[in-house]
Structure formats: structure tokens, C-alpha cells
Amino acid sequence: MARYLGPKLKLSRREGTDLFLKSGVRAIDTKCKIDNAPGQHGARRGRLSDYGVQLREKQKVRRTYGVLEKQFRNYYKEAARLKGNTGENLLQLLEGRLDNVVYRMGFGSTRAESRQLVSHKAILVNGTVVNVPSFKVAANDVVSIREKAKNQARIKAALEVATQRELPTWVEVDNSKLEGTFKRLPERSDLSADINEHLIVELYSK
């Protein structure tokens, strides 16, 4: 499945919630009818079956983290093999992706922009260039901006945006050095209550 390149707001309207794909902090403009699905008959959202509800939740999480369908299924399989709660394991695996960590640290204003920074070799992990967005960041890994990329306007703009949102407790950032430490994997209580990972587990357990 190819990566979606169309309007970002359309995805948020499809899921009925702001996925923060367009901006890292600014809520969707009030003119955007977030409660209406895209399309001519978007105002008439049909009642979903149990399967439909589960599918929409999976799509919401997958699109939030910018992961393709095959990747997402592989993350679920890995989460199911790990000890503990499968749903929580899944969210932790997604949070540990390098592109997501770059976003959480405020070096990219969106996950998509953060993914691009990684792909363009602007990111170091423990002093080594890593250009794989799905790279699994471990506790105490140091993530930083490569020296020749530090003056990029988009990074400066992202840092400005980041000052308007609360820094997650599981990362520590030194903006003067443009580097941060991934202290630990987040606990479930650290993450959005708008995500119902149990629905995703039910979907894949069928």
C-alpha cells in the first residue's frame, strides 16, 4: 500500500478527530467540519458495526503515527509476542520509532516532517547518522540534529511550535544543543486517552 499524499485534513475528517497531521500544536481550523466525513454525503455518517468501529480505531492510530498497513500489522504481531498487555505494547512500539521520538522532542512540527528529517540524514542517534524512520530507539539513547542541519528553517520553526506544547515526561531535551535523551518508554497513562487500543486487539484477534 502506497503512502497517502493527499490532503491531511481529509484523513482527520475521515476519523472524526484531529490527528495532528497538519500542525504539531494548532487545532484544526473551526471552518473544517471535523465531525463530517469527506465527500458529498459526509454529513451523514452511517452507524458503524462492531467491526467498523474496530477498523476505524485501527486506521486512526495507524494514520496518527504515519505507518503503512503492513508495518502496522507487523507491529501488532511483535506486540502480541511480548509479555504484558498487547495493546499497550503496540503503543510503546509505535512511540519508540525514531521519527516519532524526533517529533516528541520537538525537532519536527509533525511526524511526517520528522520522518523526512530522518530520511534526509539530519538525525543522529548516539552520534551516528540513522536514516531509517522505523529505527527502534532504546532507553537512554541520545537523539540529536546533525551539525550541518542545525540551521534549517523548518527545525527552528518546529522548536518554536514545540514551546507551545508540553514536553512528554519520557524525553529530555536540551534545545541549546539540539539534542534529547529518550529516558524510557511511555506508560499507558502517559499517552492519549482518545486511543482505544483494546478495539485494535479485538480486530486482529478475529
Swiss-Prot record:
It comes from the Bacteria. GO terms for molecular function: rRNA binding; structural constituent of ribosome. Residues 96-156 form the S4 RNA-binding domain. The keyword Ribonucleoprotein applies. GO terms for cellular component: small ribosomal subunit. Keywords: Ribonucleoprotein, Ribosomal protein, RNA-binding, rRNA-binding. Gene3D superfamilies: Ribosomal Protein S4 Delta 41, Chain A, domain 1, RNA-binding S4 domain. InterPro entries: Ribosomal_uS4, Ribosomal_uS4_bac-type, Ribosomal_uS4_CS, Ribosomal_uS4_N, S4_RNA-bd, S4_RNA-bd_sf. One of its GO terms (biological process) is translation. PROSITE patterns: RIBOSOMAL_S4 (PS00632), S4 (PS50889). Belongs to the universal ribosomal protein uS4 family. HAMAP family: Ribosomal_uS4_B. One of the primary rRNA binding proteins, it binds directly to 16S rRNA where it nucleates assembly of the body of the 30S subunit. With S5 and S12 plays an important role in translational accuracy. Part of the 30S ribosomal subunit. Contacts protein S5. The interaction surface between S4 and S5 is involved in control of translational fidelity. This is Small ribosomal subunit protein uS4.
